[in-house]
Amino acid sequence: MFEGWNKGWENWGGNQQFDYLEPYADFDLERIAAYAREKGVQLWMHNETGGNIPEYEAVLEAAMRRYAELGVHTLKTGYAGGFKGGYLHHSQYGVQHYQRVVETAAKYRIMLDVHEPIKETGIRRTWPNMMTREGARGMEWNAWSEGNSAEYLTTLPFVRMLSGPMDYTPGIFDIDYSTAKADKGRIEWNGPNAECCIKTTLARQIANWVIIYSPLQMAADLIENYEGHPAFRFFRDFDADCDWSKALQGEIGDYIVVARRAKDRHFLGAGTDEKARTLVQKLDFLEPGVTYTATIYADAPDAGRNPEAYLIGKRAVTARDTIRIEMAERGGQAITFIPAEK
């Protein structure tokens, strides 16, 4: 996914006026789209409106048509800030706009990931291209504020997730921002003394891919923070197209354990609050009679004070087995269960 590709970002924070068809001179949209098709890679387009609805609707049809022509069939929209004219997101004006976007996107076979959305209404049952939405305080808040606590992340599944999928954009590996803080743009954005960081362990960041369900998932960190990282294997093995889910254990604001299945693979995600915790979990959600290779992404013993410390282990398991889930403060654990080769 690319954000900031289109002209108009120089007005951000003021009178937002974006061009949803014209890229900046140094961003060759057609060439990038052609290269993606050649490599079999699907692109995500991004449309930030800044709440300027009349401007967006004036080119909505043309923009969707153009994206489809380029082979782009996934679009993330954004509505940061209030709507122009003083309308609220949940006003009749706002709701009608969101409906118009969903229907227009469906016409061009484009899936939507809506940020700053209205509440889940069940519209995805009628318009299944409405794949996921933000609708709560997401990962991005860790970039400029006190961030999202581990307790918040053990509350979110019991509240926000009741209404449907959420695009939280989990999966950050640069937990203490040691890489990001050295970036000139980051210093200009946050200031030289900012204490922004991720408030969980790395293992919990991986577990959130399972806990916070979205059929469109995004590894949201910088590419260089993933390159050569052993834990990135989880994202390669994960299948977001889950056809079965179950909450296995949990207490609101304290801890949670979730299992999901996609085809013949199962995934488990567990997370705790600011308290270290050990849980015992039966694996009876697995297919009986099948032996799985469980790849476990866990907190290292010192993860409470070194949140990027993690362990990766493997073991053979069946539905008759039980596992211990050991989590550090603000920690978690993620497991992939892949049928063993016969």
Predicted features by range, described:
Residues 203-247:
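Catalytic cores of secreted or luminal carbohydrate-active enzymes
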Residues 296-320:
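Solvent-exposed beta-strand/loop surfaces of large extracellular or lumenal domains
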Residues 314-342:
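C-terminal beta-strand-rich structural cap/linker in extracellular carbohydrate-active enzymes
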Residues 245-248, 257-258, 312-314, 322-325:
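Beta-strand-rich interaction surfaces with strong enrichment in secreted/lumenal proteins
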Residues 3-195:
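Aromatic- and carboxylate-enriched substrate-binding clefts and catalytic-loop regions
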Residues 286-300:
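Solvent-exposed beta-hairpin/edge-strand motifs
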Residues 112, 211, 268:
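Conserved, mostly hydrophobic/aromatic
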